[in-house]
From Swiss-Prot:
<protein>
    <recommendedName>
        <fullName>Biofilm regulator BssR</fullName>
    </recommendedName>
</protein>
<dbReference type="Pfam" id="PF10799">
    <property type="entry name" value="YliH"/>
</dbReference>
<comment type="function">
    <text>Represses biofilm formation in M9C glu and LB glu media but not in M9C and LB media. Seems to act as a global regulator of several genes involved in catabolite repression and stress response and regulation of the uptake and export of signaling pathways. Could be involved the regulation of indole as well as uptake and export of AI-2 through a cAMP-dependent pathway.</text>
</comment>
<dbReference type="GO" id="GO:1900190">
    <property type="term" value="P:regulation of single-species biofilm formation"/>
</dbReference>
<dbReference type="InterPro" id="IPR020359">
    <property type="entry name" value="Biofilm_regulator_BssR"/>
</dbReference>
<dbReference type="GO" id="GO:0010468">
    <property type="term" value="P:regulation of gene expression"/>
</dbReference>
């Protein structure tokens, strides 16, 4: 039961991160830039969630099958890549940042696929 709650919590946190990343990418494409504070806040949240995913996936190791394990690692990778991407883009202006929206979109796609895989696996377990 405890393991199921941890899985659900991780899945919900990943979904929230995906929503945040999708909103950021959409705004970045519309404006052409983002504020440094927005980027730093999102980056810090992604690094924190990445660390939590890593720690919790190690604790859940005995309760995860290969597909779940792989999906969690792909999600970790997508979050880390997005966070690193958010560190780039500082140019002449200290208050705005122009990160690579294409890289962030790739991270968003990878994160979405990982979440879908985890959701599919959760539905199969309930059945």
């Amino acid at each position: 039961m405890f393991v199921d709650r941890q899985r659900i919590d991780l899945l919900n946190r990943l979904i929230d991160a995906r929503v945040d990343l999708a909103a950021y990418v959409q705004l970045r494409k519309a404006k052409g830039y983002m504020s440094v504070s927005e980027s730093n806040h999102l980056r810090d949240n992604f690094f924190k969630l990445n660390r939590e995913l890593h720690d919790k996936s190690l604790r859940l190791n005995l309760h995860l099958d290969q597909e779940e394990w792989s999906a969690l690692h792909h999600a970790e990778e997508a979050l880390a890549t997005a966070a690193v991407c958010l560190m780039s883009g500082h140019h002449d202006c200290p208050t705005v940042i122009t990160v690579n929206a294409d890289k962030l979109e790739n991270c968003l796609m990878s994160l979405t696929l990982s979440i879908q895989s985890l959701q599919k696996h959760a539905m199969l377990e309930k059945a």
